[in-house]
Structure formats: C-alpha cells, structure tokens
C-alpha cells in the first residue's frame, strides 16, 4: 500500500527535473538522485501515521492516577519514637537537621495550633508535608531503580546522591476535601517500596495496619482526619497546585520561593519544570 505513492513521487521528481533541464537546476545525476531521495522521504513521511508526543498521556491535574483507600497516619517534625513509630523525627531521610530547620516541634496537639501551624512560632518550612515509603538515595548515591521508576527523573536529576523526590507536591483527598503537601520524608516503616509509590502495588503489611502514607498535622487538620484514617493520594505538578494554606509558609515552599523571585531551577529544581507553564 505504501509502494505506489513512493513510485509516483519518484515519477513526479523525474518529470519535474526533465522539464527544468533548460534552467540547469540539477547539474548532475548525483544531484538528481539526492533530490529524488528527498521527495521519496517526504512522501513516506506524509503517508506514515503521525504520533504527536504526549497524546497518549494525561496532562494537568489528571496526569498521575489516584492511589485509593490508603491507610494514612499522622507524623510530625520533632516526633519522639514510639512502639508503632520507632524512628524519631528530629531528622528526615534528606535533612539531618529537619527539626532545627523547621523551627522547632510541629506540635500536633490541636489546642496548640492555629491556622494550620504551631501557635508558638511560624515554621521556616512548609507545614503541609508528607512521607511516602521510598527513598531514591542511599549512602550518598542514587538507587539504580530510581532512573526507571521515577517519572520525572530525567528532568530533575542533577548528580548521584541528590534526591529527585524531596519537595515534590502531592494531593491528599479525604471525602470531598483535598489538601496539597510536599514530600519531605520517607516512610512509614519502609524506604524501598517504589512498586507502590510509583506503580500499581498496594502498601505492604506493617505495624500500623498497612499504612502507606504519613501526613503532617496541618494536612490532618485541613482534611478533618481523626488520627489514623483512610485517604487517597496522587502526585501533582506544582503548576496544578491551587492557592491555599499550603502555599503560605516555608523556605522550601515552591510558591514562597516564587514570590521572592528565586530561580527555581537553582533552589527548587524538583518542582521547577512543573512550574514552567504557570510562570509563563
């Protein structure tokens, strides 16, 4: 089915070239062959079905699918270890001075909070944060599976050992309410379950009834959670995050940095590509 148009194309160029001999536009048989091949390639290009990059992928808020029915627990910066949470949260997987950089204990007691932040101080980092059970780095290098598992790896990777996950935005849904938060730690319990975080697997059993998401007190309060709960979550690009209490505070907050006029490609590379269209 594709041969006949190509023959016609070659016939066309032959006739055209013969008719223009008086003008000497083609001066040799070599030039003739090159011109014929160009027309042949153009004919094939027009005959082949064209695939536009990205047409098979969802865009905008629907680019990433929801992870539904995930047992969700609450954690906080400065949290002390307990039987069900043996790892203290003075440091995170990516920040050895997390509590210090945050500004102190992110007290979860509702009576000691106001407008989604601790009543005693304004946090220096975004109070809307989460943990998911995968870390793309270990011992100063990048895990080998991260390159194929993380959808935005190619865009944001800078060097081995620097996370492409820290600070990425996710949406967390409970009922008809959706909160937005940044990925700032790894857990609960695991840091290796990329098949769940980026694939179709479900969270693995653990001491908290198979919990697959930790959320901060600010996320808890916005969603109206009462301790352990069940939520849905998904990744979102920064440009698809609507204004809200999650865009107000923090030196690590994409939107605070943007308002300050910072170069996101230098200070928030993991979200910079996701903000490009919003800035345009």
Language model segments and positions:
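Positively charged n-region of N-terminal signal peptides that target proteins for export
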Residues: 1-5
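Bacterial N-terminal signal peptides
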Residues: 6-15
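Sec/Tat signal peptide C-region and signal peptidase I cleavage site
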Residues: 17-21
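Secreted/periplasmic proteins
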Residues: 23-280
């Amino acid at each position: 089915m594709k041969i006949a148009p190509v023959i016609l194309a070659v016939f066309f160029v032959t006739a055209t070239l013969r008719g223009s001999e008086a003008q000497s536009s083609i001066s040799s048989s070599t030039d003739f062959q090159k011109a014929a091949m160009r027309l042949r390639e153009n004919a094939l290009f027009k005959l082949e079905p064209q695939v536009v990059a990205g047409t098979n992928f969802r865009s905008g808020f629907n680019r990433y699918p929801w992870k539904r029915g995930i047992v969700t627990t609450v954690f906080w910066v400065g949290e002390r270890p307990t039987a069900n949470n043996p790892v203290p949260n003075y440091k995170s997987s990516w920040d050895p001075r997390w509590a210090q950089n945050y500004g102190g204990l992110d007290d979860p007691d509702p009576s000691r909070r106001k407008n989604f932040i601790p009543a005693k101080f304004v946090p220096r980092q975004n109070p809307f944060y989460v943990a998911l059970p995968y870390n793309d780095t270990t011992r100063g290098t990048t895990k080998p599976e991260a390159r194929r598992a993380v959808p935005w790896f190619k865009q944001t990777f800078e060097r081995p050992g620097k996370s492409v996950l820290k600070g990425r935005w996710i949406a967390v849904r409970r009922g008809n309410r959706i909160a937005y938060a940044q990925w700032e730690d790894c857990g609960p319990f695991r840091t290796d379950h990329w098949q769940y975080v980026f694939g179709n697997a479900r969270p693995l059993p653990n001491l908290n009834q198979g919990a697959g998401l930790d959320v901060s007190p600010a996320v808890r309060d916005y969603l109206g959670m009462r301790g352990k709960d069940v939520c849905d979550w998904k990744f979102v690009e920064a440009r698809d995050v609507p204004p809200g209490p999650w865009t107000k505070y923090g030196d690590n907050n994409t939107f605070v940095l943007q308002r300050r006029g910072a170069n996101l490609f230098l200070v928030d590379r993991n979200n910079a590509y996701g903000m490009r269209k919003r800035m345009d």
